[in-house]
Amino acid sequence: MSYLLRKPQSHEVSNGVKLVHEVTTSNSDLTYVEFKVLDLASGSSYTEELKKQEICIVAVTGKITVTDHESTFENIGTRESVFERKPTDSVYISNDRAFEITAVSDARVALCYSPSEKQLPTKLIKAEDNGIEHRGQFSNKRTVHNILPDSDPSANSLLVVEVYTDSGNWSSYPPHKHDQDNLPEESFLEETYYHELDPGQGFVFQRVYTDDRSIDETMTVENENVVIVPAGYHPVGVPDGYTSYYLNVMAGPTRKWKFYNDPAHEWILER
C-alpha cells in the first residue's frame, strides 16, 4: 500500500467516540496540515485543547453541538449522508482555545488543523454560506462547496472545501499542483483528501506525482480512505457508475490557493 494512502480505522478514544483517521505531522510527511475523522455516538462528547493550531470542525454527517466555552453552536449539521449533496455546517476555532463536540445524533466529524499564532474569532460557518461552484467541462466536471476559501479571512492558514465528481469524470484535472512558494505564480499548500464513494463498494484512482518523479504514486482509493499530498500533481478519476465525494484540507506558509497546471496536459483546457 502506498505511504500516501490511509485506510480507515476504528479505535475507541473515549466512551462513544471512535477515531477513524488521524494524519499528523509526526506520522506523515506533512508540516502544515493535520486531519482527523471521528465517529460520535448520540450523546457522546469529544474535547480537545488547541495550542498553536487553528481548527475547522466539519459536521460531515449527523448533528452536533460545538462550544469553545465562550460561543456555543447547537444542533448543527444538515445531512445524514454526504451524497445528499447539500452543504453542511462547520465551526472555525482559533489557536489556544479548548473546544467540546457533543453528538446530538450519531455523527461523523472531520477535524481540520493548521498552524496558527494570531487568535481570530470563533465562527459558525453556516451551510447556506458555503459558496457553490460548478467547475470544468466535458469529462472534467465537478461541484464544489467552499467552506473556508482563501477569499474568506476567517482563518490564518486553513483552506477547506468539499468536492463532488460524477460518474466517469475527472477532478483536480488537468493535473495541477501547489508545491512552490512562488507567488503570484504558485503557492505552497499541502493537502489531504478524505474520500467517500456512492455506492460504498466503489473506488477512484488518484495519482500523486512531481515533475522529477521523486513522488509518483498511483492509488486505488476506496470508501473512507485518506490520501496525503505533501507535494505534486494529484488528479482523481471516477469510474463509471459511481459518484465521488472528497473533503480537502490545505495549508501552507501563505493562505492563498494558486495552482500550476502540468504543462503536458494543459492543452485540455484549450479545447
Swiss-Prot record:
**Assigned EC number:** 5.3.1.30
> What are the BP-aspect GO terms?
inositol catabolic process
| Listed GO MF terms | 5-deoxy-D-glucuronate isomerase activity; glucuronate isomerase activity
Q: Does the keyword Isomerase apply?
A: yes
Pathway the protein takes part in: Polyol metabolism; myo-inositol degradation into acetyl-CoA; acetyl-CoA from myo-inositol: step 4/7
A Pfam family this protein belongs to? KduI
Catalytic activities = 5-deoxy-D-glucuronate = 5-dehydro-2-deoxy-D-gluconate
Task: Show the InterPro entries listed in the entry.
Answer: Deoxy-glucuronate_isom_IolB, IolB_Bacilli, KduI/IolB_isomerase, RmlC-like_jellyroll, RmlC_Cupin_sf
Q: What class of enzyme is it?
A: isomerase
Q: Which UniProt keywords apply?
A: Isomerase
As for what it does, the entry says: Involved in the isomerization of 5-deoxy-glucuronate (5DG) to 5-dehydro-2-deoxy-D-gluconate (DKG or 2-deoxy-5-keto-D-gluconate).
Family label: Belongs to the isomerase IolB family.
HAMAP family from the xrefs? IolB (MF_01673)
**Protein name, as recorded:** 5-deoxy-glucuronate isomerase
Q: Which organism is it from?
A: Bacillus subtilis subsp. natto
